[in-house]
């Protein structure tokens, strides 16, 4: 009933507002329906649907998601044009009703619009929170939590273990200690993260596709769910902030180095800065949400891929155990010697992108793009998942072959547009070093200590590598 009412309302609105627009030279487009545009062509795995459409209509496609014009990029050359040549023009973010509610009307770094406020916040994240020096200062936190992970696995040796839960726990503990100073709060925000990541996925609210009809989200109950989740986030973050402020007032904040303390110092040093309490809470939620979800997901895919490919597992075990011979554990100083480990991590992130379409961008102005007319306000989806499986760029792209990265110049830092696990340009992920420091240390120590088998006599071909799509690509 609600959906029928919605369609009738949109149809009437279209008739009343119909007007001629100058013809533009747009990229090729699949046939679209009135009102909904191309939404019916996007299945539960958007990266698959868009890749299949691109094979027919080309690496640049013009789509319509409801009233929203969308440019879909599915080639390395086109990705370079967006992320490098026209990076500033495509530096904005589209409006997201969910993100707007959760992140205090756009005060975070990931989803905020491209403004002077965003530039200041991004600078703080890059120079104060995620600099090489700062990431290195958290080495003890990483090593302590990885030691606990290894101990937990040892305590369950010869038993069936749930690696997913253990990886979420170790990642959550690292990110939580670094962000708020304590790993005890992981359980408080873990469920919230999963709920919000699901709501931020590509099956978004009606309001995002039809801004005039946001009331439909109220009828379907989505708005209530978002409000409840946003309140849970704020209650959690407000508690964290009050604890830190109380400790600082009583001079008990002894050499605190967590992100909340750093941001409070910035706030105190410049009372007129953009760093108000809502900004602090938004940035901390960015770190907690993006850090925990993406790192644990990448780790799960990597270990699953190694278990499913025993030849690669054996090569990595030989390398790690040779370098770690006579040691009880692998230290961060050892990681730089492990070339096959680095190749494994790169190959895992090529096949199993945690963000297969990156976070959508939006054009800030009209632009002539690769011969086509792209209007201001066009949403841009870069199908990095499809680019990384392009057979013209990668030999046997569907196979897990870490060897392809040995003696290769290709890296994950955003300069090779055939391989963009962290994005690139102004909107590229600033947490690359933080994420890889955790990823490599966890995998190296787990492989150093343990051999893995599937439970109950399962065969390798039975290992389910199905993905669950959302804003991140989690293993089923």
Swiss-Prot record:
Q: How does activity depend on pH?
A: Optimum pH is 7.5.
- Name the Enzyme Commission number(s) assigned to this protein: 1.14.14.141
Cite a GO CC annotation.
membrane
Question: Which reactions is this enzyme annotated as catalysing?
Answer: (7S)-marmesin + reduced [NADPH--hemoprotein reductase] + O2 = psoralen + acetone + oxidized [NADPH--hemoprotein reductase] + 2 H2O + H(+)
Q: Which Pfam families match?
A: p450
Q: Using the UniProt record, give the first listed, main subcellular location.
A: membrane
Which superkingdom does the taxonomy of this entry point to? Eukaryota
Industrial or biotech use: Psoralen possesses photocarcinogen properties. It intercalates in double-stranded DNA and cross-links pyrimidine bases under UV-A irradiation. Psoralen is widely used in combination with UV-A radiation to treat a variety of skin disorders like psoriasis or eczema.
TM spans (from-to): 1-18
Q: Which UniProt keywords apply?
A: Endoplasmic reticulum, Heme, Iron, Membrane, Metal-binding, Microsome, Monooxygenase, Oxidoreductase, Transmembrane, Transmembrane helix
Indicate how the chain sits in the lipid bilayer: Single-pass membrane protein
Instruction: Report the top EC class in one word.
Output: oxidoreductase
One Gene Ontology MF term: heme binding
The cysteines joined by S-S bonds are none
Q: Which PANTHER family match?
A: CYTOCHROME P450 71A2-LIKE (PTHR47955:SF15), CYTOCHROME P450 FAMILY 71 PROTEIN (PTHR47955)
Q: What does this protein do?
A: Involved in linear furanocumarin (psoralen) biosynthesis. Converts marmesin to psoralen and, with much lower affinity, 5-hydroxymarmesin to bergaptol.
Q: Which family does it belong to?
A: Belongs to the cytochrome P450 family.
Protein name per its UniProtKB record? Psoralen synthase
What gene is this protein a product of?
Answer: CYP71AJ2
């Amino acid at each position: 009933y609600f959906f029928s009412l919605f369609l009738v309302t949109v149809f009437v609105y279209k008739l009343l507002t119909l007007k001629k627009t100058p013809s533009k030279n747009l990229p090729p487009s699949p046939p679209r329906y009135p009102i909904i545009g191309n939404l019916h062509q996007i299945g539960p795995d958007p990266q698959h649907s868009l890749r299949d459409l691109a094979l027919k209509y080309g690496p640049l496609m013009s789509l319509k998601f409801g009233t929203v014009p969308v440019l879909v990029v599915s080639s390395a050359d086109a990705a370079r044009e967006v992320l490098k040549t026209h990076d500033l023009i495509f530096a904005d973010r589209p409006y997201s009703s969910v993100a707007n509610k959760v992140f205090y009307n756009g005060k975070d770094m990931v989803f905020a619009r491209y403004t002077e406020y965003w530039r200041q916040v991004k600078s703080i994240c890059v120079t104060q929170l995620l600099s090489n020096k700062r990431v290195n200062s958290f080495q003890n936190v990483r090593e302590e939590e990885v030691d606990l992970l290894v101990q937990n696995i040892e305590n369950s040796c010869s038993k069936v273990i749930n690696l997913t839960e253990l990886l979420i726990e170790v990642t959550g503990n690292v990110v939580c200690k670094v962000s708020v100073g304590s790993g005890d709060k992981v359980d408080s925000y873990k469920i919230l993260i999963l709920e919000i990541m699901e709501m931020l996925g590509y099956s978004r609210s009606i309001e995002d596709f039809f801004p005039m009809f946001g009331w439909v989200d109220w009828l379907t109950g989505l708005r209530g769910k978002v409000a409840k989740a946003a309140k849970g986030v704020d209650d959690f973050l407000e508690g964290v902030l009050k604890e830190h402020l109380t400790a600082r007032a009583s001079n008990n904040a002894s050499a605190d180095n967590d992100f909340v303390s750093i941001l409070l110092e910035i706030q105190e040093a410049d009372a007129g800065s953009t760093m108000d309490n809502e900004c602090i809470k938004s940035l901390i939620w960015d770190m907690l949400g993006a850090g925990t979800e993406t790192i644990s997901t990448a780790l799960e895919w990597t270990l699953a891929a190694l278990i499913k490919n025993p030849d690669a597992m054996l090569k990595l075990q030989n390398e790690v155990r040779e370098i770690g011979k006579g040691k009880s554990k692998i230290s961060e100083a050892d990681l730089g010697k492990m070339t096959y480990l680095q190749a494994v991590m790169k190959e895992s992130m090529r096949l199993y992108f945690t963000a297969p379409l990156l976070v959508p961008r939006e054009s800030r102005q009209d632009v002539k793009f690769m011969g086509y007319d792209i209007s201001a306000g066009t949403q841009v989806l870069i199908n990095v998942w499809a680019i990384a499986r392009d057979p013209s760029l990668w030999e046997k792209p569907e196979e897990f072959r870490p060897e392809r990265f040995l003696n290769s110049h290709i890296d994950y830092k955003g300069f090779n547009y055939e391989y963009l696990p962290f994005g690139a340009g102004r909107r590229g992920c600033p947490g690359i070093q933080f994420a890889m420091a955790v990823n490599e240390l966890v995998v190296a120590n787990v492989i150093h200590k343990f051999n893995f088998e599937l439970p109950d006599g399962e065969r390798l071909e039975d290992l389910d590598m199905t993905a669950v799509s959302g804003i991140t690509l989690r293993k089923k």
